[in-house]
């Protein structure tokens, strides 16, 4: 999409309103990296945005693959963990929201 009054500019909407941002970080996840090693829960949610590579989110007994330039909101009350899903490094932004 190109926003109004922009030229030679392309954008991809990653997410809309998701809550209040608590904090954020850039993660560099190496081959076979991720965590935590056991699924966990908490009160806040995670918004993950993959900028390089590919991430695999384990959600209870299912998994979700997040490709480069995609985002996914993980509800904190659902048991989850996050892992690199490629043979190289995955880089992603994690934003904690409530």
Predicted features by range, described:
Residues 12, 26-42:
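Conserved short histidine dyad/triad with adjacent acidic residue
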